[in-house]
């Protein structure tokens, strides 16, 4: 009887702790904005303020054309000369030429529903795409084609992708951008099997110029200096073998603790 009483107390404490975590999680979820459970969950994961955007996934730059892509829409802006003006640009949406409304300051807006979150600010040698984010996507017209402006005003002839999968790209903003940082870190672990890159080196290895990802999370002025995951940090710093060993110790600890709490 004495042994069963101790086991029951241990089980009750563990169960109460687990229940408190679950109830607290649902309470926080219910406090979020939204009329339905799915809306509340989405606002918890991604943030309501990010909904009214173009949801940019990739940017293609060629000699004459800047192409912006999301899951359903492609906006292309083409120029045949180095001097830019709204009247000299050609705009197409999903392959169909469209005519923008042009304001006095050179801002182009569009009547198409797919482009309701798109504005193009035309300047002498550049286009600024205001897509509903905290900062615009900046592109510059040069003699040999277009370049995008990246971190630290770096001029990019191509905008690098962290991952080619659109499904994964659409998940980048979730968990306050952590999904992007995790995918970014995993993409650079190919040479970290035995030895890692060393501590405090993450900032030098991550893709810092994935502009669509940065726009969808915070802005194009944000640098990432850590994976925001203890496990990925270990793999990147000291190697994947080191991570596997630590995970083995953690699993052993959890199994032994579970047996101690509920088992014989």
Task: Describe each PLM feature range.
Residues 5, 33-34, 257-262:
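Membrane-interfacial segments
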Residues 18-25, 250:
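Hydrophobic core of alpha-helical transmembrane segments in multi-pass integral membrane proteins
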Residues 26-187:
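Flexible juxtamembrane loops connecting transmembrane helices in multi-pass membrane enzymes
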Residues 145-224, 238-244:
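TM-adjacent membrane-interface loops and short helices in multi-pass inner/ER membrane proteins
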Residues 240-264:
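Hydrophobic transmembrane alpha-helices and their immediate junctions
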């Amino acid at each position: 009887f004495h042994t069963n009483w101790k086991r029951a107390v241990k089980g009750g404490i563990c169960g109460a702790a687990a229940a408190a975590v679950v109830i607290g999680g649902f309470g926080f979820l219910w406090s979020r904005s939204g009329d339905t459970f799915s809306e509340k969950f989405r606002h918890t994961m991604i943030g309501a303020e990010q909904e009214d955007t173009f949801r940019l996934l990739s940017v293609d730059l060629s000699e004459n054309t800047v192409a912006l892509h999301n899951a359903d829409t492609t906006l292309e802006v083409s120029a045949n000369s180095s001097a830019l003006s709204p009247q000299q640009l050609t705009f197409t949406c999903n392959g169909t030429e469209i005519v923008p409304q042009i304001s006095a300051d050179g801002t182009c807006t569009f009547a198409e529903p797919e482009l309701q979150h798109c504005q193009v600010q035309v300047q002498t040698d550049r286009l600024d795409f205001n897509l509903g984010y905290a900062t615009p996507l900046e592109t510059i017209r040069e003699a040999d084609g277009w370049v995008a402006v990246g971190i630290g005003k770096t001029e990019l002839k191509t905008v690098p992708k962290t991952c080619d999968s659109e499904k994964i790209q659409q998940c980048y903003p979730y968990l306050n951008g952590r999904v992007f940082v995790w995918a970014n870190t995993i993409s650079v672990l190919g040479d970290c099997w035995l030895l890692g890159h060393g501590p405090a080196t993450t900032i030098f290895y991550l893709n810092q110029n994935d502009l669509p990802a940065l726009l969808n999370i915070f802005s194009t002025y944000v640098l990432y200096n850590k994976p925001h995951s203890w496990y990925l940090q270990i793999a990147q710093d000291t190697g994947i073998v080191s991570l596997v060993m630590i995970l083995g110790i953690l699993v052993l600890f959890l199994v032994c603790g579970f047996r101690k709490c509920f088992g014989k």
